[in-house]
Amino acid sequence: MPQKLYRSLDANLAFLEERFGRSDDFYTKRLMIAGIPCAVVMFTGLSSPEKLCRMALDMLDRDPAMLGGGEGLCVYLLTQSRIPAEPDAVEDTTALVELLTNGLSILLIDGVRKAVAFSTQEMPQRSISAPTGEGNLRGSQEAFTELLRNNISLLRRQFRTGTLTAEIYTAHTRAKTEYCLCYDSALAPKETIDALRARLEQVEIPVLLDSAYFASFLKQDKLNLFPAAAYTERPATACARLCEGKAIVLVAGCPYALVVPSFFAEHFECLDDYASSAVFAGLIRILKYLAFLLAVFGPGLYVMAVAFAPEIIPVRLLTKLAQGEVSTPLPPMLEMLSVTLLLEIVREAGLRAPQSISHTVSLVGALIIGETAVSAGIVSVPVLTMAAAATIATLAVPSLYEQSILFRFAVILLAGCFGVPGLACAALTILAMACGSEPFGYDYLYPLLPPGRASLRDGFVRSIWSRLAKSGEVIGRHEA
């Protein structure tokens, strides 16, 4: 049960001093308004005292209102004054602390068990910049920032409709982090939004620093490696998903939006697909599918062919491969695993190292270590070439990077230990995992499977805009 505010101004200030007194950025200012003892409290790093005085107190001094005591002052500020105060009064200590930590200024009035909140937030923020993880040639070059309400405004600026709904909640974390559920109420299926809202409200974690923290709670099958949600740092991409009837989850402090639900085919799409010609976009999309297959099955297929089925390799190519393998001490499976692990270590080192030396780390690892390993006869040139090709292919579909790496290691192990049956088992397991994934009751492989007109309209390839506009594709309204 929340504790009500005290009637005494001194008692309310004593409570706040006990809670925040050791914080040097906690600001308290006693003042008299129309002869009534009051106090303004705020955090100087989150709110601006100058902004409060300019917006509220100066205006109040010019208003010749007959206030009639503390209660009259509170009612006047909430209902009659031109001062843009919050519409609801603060009545308990829990709400008082929450509003203060959210950057609002609070006016405490002596003799009244209510307080008035003012939106005077002035938080440090990063300016809107270009996306760093989703490169596009055309389209908007804006990216989300760490401020929740800025991100909501970016969505509303591009998605100008009265049906865009933004519901802000406080997560069950110690830090009381806010998150926002955005959707188009005219397009998003109500049962999907209700289910998503219920799952988000049930999440209880110590801290919420990223929208990705929600992802594991949205999956029905926790062992399924395919994601039930996608991520984007582009407001334009988020608006495109809203037009499809999907939901967007924004988290305060995170510049990435969570898109729910997510389908397999969407990982191979980008904004440039819809700004380019249909033929070129279809070609690029097919190349991405081939790159994903190469990233997952390429190294395992090489190990299986060299170790168990050399007869499927052309004679000239087999001769070259044999010359390379003769000089190496490791069997093909261990050789491929070691090179793949080395490339992942180099990638991780380049990613985590300081930006000033990250490129140097990548170049040293990729060129010097690779060349040294081949010259020393530890690994063969064909193995290094295949592993490097698979690593580059993985970058063509960055949103499935984690899945590509995990699947690649599994395929190498199964193909290296059991040959053709192992490779087939790995492929069937991955396919079964994709077919068995049903984010919020929808087919994860739609529109790729089952094959139909949707597969050619906006699946493996993209149709022309006139046909896309007529389809009006929205989740929950799939064609048979």
Residue positions per predicted region:
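Membrane-embedded alpha-helical signal segments
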Residues: 1-297, 315, 435-480
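Functionally constrained cores in energy, signaling, and assembly domains
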Residues: 84, 105, 137, 166, ...
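Short glycine/serine/threonine-biased micro-segments
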Residues: 137, 160, 368, 375, ...
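Transmembrane alpha-helical segments that form the functional core of multipass membrane systems
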Residues: 249, 256, 262-411
